[in-house]
């Protein structure tokens, strides 16, 4: 007999993560073993929050995720400022939309994920406009990989 909590959590399938950018929402997802994060892509902000949320819900369902991790942009001191409060509001709205599908929604500290994603892209030679288009999904991937490594 092995530890039940871990197995039941892993049995819930893949995990998706989002990075809530001002222009784009970056999305990443895990493999079914919950060990490796990959970028899914981005949802361009439409100016309609509900439409954007529904696009995220569609992506999470496409990824067959049982859990969604929403990046929480805490300040450097760990405090929840306006951006973090907005992310918490988005988290609650997504929880209401994804709950009927059995998807758990939680938050994770996303400090430095964008910086780390940008650093990785520069190291790979991706800069400028092309890099800006994928930085949000790369940041979501960094967030998710960190979450997976801690789980």
Residue ranges and their predicted role:
Residues 1-16, 23-151:
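Phosphate- and other anionic-substrate recognition elements at nucleic-acid/protein interfaces
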